[in-house]
């Protein structure tokens, strides 16, 4: 029935969805006959049925049939059977693996709509702001047509609008914005500042990128700390005179530095100190970071210099990560290395990994083109099953064997030759590189070949054109160089993307203020079309000047004009005429190119290096052969590539030498392919172990985080925080008495209980505990607690006279302030513990067990500290004291 090969287990699951899809299809004609008003009213009926006891599975068939019809009316897109299957998988809280171009964005609307009917809100998560905005404006129209509200979270969105967006039925948001909002919500001082609602259902687009690639990187909210900047400058000079394999060793697999005993002694002598590991004056972390900056972090690969600042390049997407900084002093070490201004080191205020963040959702699902290779990890950590969905049309992509060269430069020459061959026959080519540096090297080679090409990497001048470049990467003879998966989410359509270019022209003309005459994209259009377009825009001038539209409002109007959604807005109707005019002419131009490019063999994808994960390689291959188009892919490698060098290059180099392969001849064999796959599996296993270890250690901190955040929320929601303060007071008095009883046994540490309690209560000099009470510790405790309550009542009455309700505000403020300060310090201690715990393995101890034990002790210390400081801060506050 389907044109895709699956293992029997996966196929059985797919077959089980066929009867449900058949029922949905049976309703198609009935839905087509319904007027818009009646179709919209279905949402109200579904909600009513849910309130009357039915569940989501009971209404799934009819709800999906409604969304399919709405999509056809609003966007002109009909949901295919395989897309229905993908949506059922999402609704069941699983991962749907769907190939590039199979319409994942549309699939999410079905599961999103169904689950939003429960009234609990659905979060659709994408990897960047552009995709979140595109999806909310495009497929979000289906939800709006059916009466649901659609929210969009963008990076600079103000708090009030952010809160409203989260209250919508369906909210489109990036993973980072979602995670940071969660952390910020757990740092607020009043309930009104919280923007997020209770988590219910989440659909993650490109789920593998977020749950696996970014799993090792925690989300961190930080502020300035007091770390001395001069240490970075001194250790930079020190690192430059240290010798590799003498003073330190480099573990490239773990991306770590190990100081040798000789190195430790040399550093101590150079710095004139006795102990690198002294907790009062630590130097070791600064030295290790300085060496890491030199050995493991390369300019234009891991970061770029922009405006005299070090800016991180995302190793998975090739995009720059503005505003993100490496933690634990690493960023400062790289700034010292590059001789730019060293910015103050930050202290962590709040943090969470994506692993633990997304596990907060009771129901989680995702979609991607590549997840099957990581299904074991997704199942073990997230309890997410991966199901491969068959393609709508047969896959026609040819995957040519890898070519391996004995040196790197010959590899790049061969890639340039391949680009030239494709350019000559008119086939579009997409070249995936692993860094800015490599993409620019290839660009220089192509310039020597006089091959016109587009360059897409993390450099700021290229980033802005990302979607434009990718959208037109399927045109005849086009050559596009892109770092990793830049442009992921934008389809490469053979011959070019007429709808994208038509919309981008309207944006240029109306928001970018370019003219019809000067817009380079319009050069291919006929003179008559240009004149007609100019006339429409001139007629719109009056409307545009009469109303002062914001850029956001103008973008919304353009989005509506470019889709099939019904509108009676005069401006949108005129914009639609302009869009149709541009679209139709480009469609004519592009359709001829599409036919030529298809016959020539379609898009050719070139990989320039095998990634650490087979999944990332598959993502690159997946750009070709979308929706049954022809296409091909090939990887060009050399024994100098990082993966082969670190994880098995010697075997391959020896094999090439044994076969007497010269520098110019590439090697291609089954044995070689097996060696490459073995190397990748080795890396995947290594990084899985790393992520698993991160998860296991973070689980310890996560349980503590949940306890602290729950206590914070309890205080925030409380209208009477006095109870909490008095609970803390009882606990504090208990600790004081226990300490006093212990001290009685040791004359050197004896504590005067009377002085302690007098100080706590801020009592008069005449305060005295009766000698009889000392005989019974329980009675003593009850009496002191009673004194605290009496004392508290008097001070509360005094404050109520000054301002009613002031005491409650003070209590809440002190409670939250002390919890936040203690948690901040606790995170620092936990970080230090995590960094040092690995050494325990040398003493035949399990580092994780030791970490759990010590983390528990630190947590108890922190809780005790919070209770004590809150009680002392409130009882001894000047505001709480009456001036007699």
UniProtKB/Swiss-Prot annotation:
The keyword Ligase does not apply. One of its GO terms (biological process) is protein import. One of its GO terms (molecular function) is protein-exporting ATPase activity. It catalyses: ATP + H2O + cellular proteinSide 1 = ADP + phosphate + cellular proteinSide 2. It is a peripheral membrane protein. It comes from the Eukaryota. The keyword Nucleotide-binding applies. Coiled coil: none annotated. NCBIfam families: PRK12904.1, secA. This is Protein translocase subunit SecA. It comes from Pyropia yezoensis (Susabi-nori). The lineage of its organism: Eukaryota, Rhodophyta, Bangiophyceae, Bangiales, Bangiaceae. The gene is secA.
């Amino acid at each position: 029935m389907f044109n895709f090969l699956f293992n029997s287990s996966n196929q059985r699951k797919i077959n089980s969805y066929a009867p449900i899809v058949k029922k949905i299809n049976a309703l198609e004609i009935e839905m087509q006959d319904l007027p818009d008003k009646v179709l919209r009213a279905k949402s109200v009926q579904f909600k009513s049925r849910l309130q009357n006891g039915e569940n989501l599975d009971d209404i799934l068939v009819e709800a999906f049939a409604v969304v399919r019809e709405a999509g056809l009316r609003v966007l002109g897109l009909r949901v295919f059977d395989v897309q229905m299957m993908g949506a059922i998988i999402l609704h069941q809280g699983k991962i749907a693996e769907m190939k590039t171009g199979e319409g994942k964005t549309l699939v999410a609307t079905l599961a999103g709509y169904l689950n939003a009917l429960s009234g609990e809100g659905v979060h659709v998560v994408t990897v960047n702001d552009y995709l979140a905005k595109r999806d909310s404006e495009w497929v979000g129209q289906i939800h709006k047509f059916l009466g649901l509200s659609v929210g969009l979270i963008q990076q600079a969105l103000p708090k009030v609008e952010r809160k409203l967006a989260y209250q919508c039925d369906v909210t489109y948001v990036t993973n980072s914005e979602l995670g940071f909002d969660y952390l910020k919500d757990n740092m607020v001082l009043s309930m009104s500042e919280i923007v997020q609602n209770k988590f219910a259902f989440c659909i993650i687009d490109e789920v593998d990128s977020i749950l696996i690639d970014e799993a090792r990187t925690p989300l961190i909210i930080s502020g300035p700390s007091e770390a001395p900047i001069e240490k970075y400058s001194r250790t930079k000079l020190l690192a430059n005179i240290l010798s590799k394999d003498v003073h330190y060793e480099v573990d490239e697999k773990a991306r770590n530095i190990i100081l040798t005993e000789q190195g430790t002694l040399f550093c101590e002598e150079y710095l004139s100190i006795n102990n690198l590991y002294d907790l009062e004056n630590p130097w070791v972390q600064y030295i290790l970071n300085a060496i890491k900056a030199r050995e493991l972090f390369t300019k234009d690969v891991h970061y770029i210099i922009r405006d005299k600042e070090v800016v991180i390049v995302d190793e998975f997407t090739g995009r720059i990560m503005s505003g993100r900084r490496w933690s634990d002093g690493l960023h400062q070490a790289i700034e010292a290395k590059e001789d730019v201004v060293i910015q103050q080191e930050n202290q962590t205020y709040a943090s969470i990994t994506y692993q633990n963040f997304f596990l907060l959702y009771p129901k989680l699902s995702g979609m991607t083109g590549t997840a099957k290779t990581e299904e074991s990890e997704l199942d073990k950590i997230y309890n997410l099953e991966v199901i491969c969905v068959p393609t709508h049309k047969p896959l026609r992509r040819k995957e040519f064997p890898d070519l391996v060269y004995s040196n790197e430069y010959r590899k790049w020459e061969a890639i340039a030759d391949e680009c030239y061959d494709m350019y000559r026959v008119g086939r579009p080519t997409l070249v995936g590189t692993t860094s800015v540096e490599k993409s620019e090297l290839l660009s220089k080679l192509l310039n020597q070949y006089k091959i016109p090409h587009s360059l897409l990497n993390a450099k700021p001048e290229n980033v802005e054109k990302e979607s434009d470049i990718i959208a037109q990467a399927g045109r005849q003879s086009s050559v596009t160089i892109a770092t990793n998966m830049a442009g992921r989410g934008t389809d490469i359509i053979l011959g070019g993307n007429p709808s994208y270019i038509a919309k981008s022209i309207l944006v240029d003309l109306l928001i970018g203020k370019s003219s019809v005459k000067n817009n380079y994209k319009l050069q291919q259009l006929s003179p008559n079309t240009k004149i007609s377009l100019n006339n429409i825009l001139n007629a719109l001038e009056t409307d545009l000047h009469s109303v002062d539209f914001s850029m956001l409002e103008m973008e919304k109007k353009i989005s509506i004009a470019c889709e099939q959604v019904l509108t009676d807005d005069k401006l949108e109707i005129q914009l639609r005429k302009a869009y149709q005019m541009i679209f139709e002419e480009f469609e004519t131009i592009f359709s001829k190119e599409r036919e030529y490019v298809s016959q020539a063999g379609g898009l050719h994808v070139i990989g320039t290096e095998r990634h650490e994960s087979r999944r990332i390689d598959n993502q690159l291959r997946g750009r070709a052969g979308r929706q049954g188009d022809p296409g091909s892919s090939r990887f060009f490698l050399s024994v100098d590539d990082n993966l082969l060098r670190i994880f098995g290059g010697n075997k391959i180099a020896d094999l090439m030498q044994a076969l007497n392969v010269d520098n110019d001849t590439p090697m291609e064999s089954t044995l070689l392919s097996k060696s490459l796959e073995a190397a990748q599996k080795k890396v995947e296993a290594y990084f899985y172990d790393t992520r698993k270890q991160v998860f296991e250690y973070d689980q310890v901190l996560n349980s503590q985080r949940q306890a602290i955040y729950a206590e914070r929320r309890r205080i925030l929601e409380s209208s009477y925080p006095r109870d909490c303060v008095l609970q803390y007071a009882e606990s504090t008095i208990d600790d004081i008495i226990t300490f006093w009883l212990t001290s009685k046994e040791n004359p050197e540490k004896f504590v005067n209980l009377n002085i302690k309690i007098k100080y706590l209560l801020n009592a008069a000099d005449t305060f005295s505990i009766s000698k009889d009470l000392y005989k019974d510790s329980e009675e003593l405790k009850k009496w002191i607690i009673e004194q605290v309550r009496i004392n508290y009542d008097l001070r509360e009455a005094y404050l109520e006279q000054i301002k009613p309700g002031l005491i409650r505000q003070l209590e809440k403020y002190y409670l939250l302030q002390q919890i936040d300060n203690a948690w901040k310090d606790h995170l620092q201690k936990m970080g230090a513990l995590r960094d040092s715990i690995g050494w325990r393995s040398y003493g035949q101890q399990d580092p994780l067990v030791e970490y759990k034990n010590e983390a528990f002790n630190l947590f108890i210390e922190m809780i005790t500290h919070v209770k004590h400081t809150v009680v002392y801060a409130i009882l001894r506050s000047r505001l709480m004291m009456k001036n007699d």
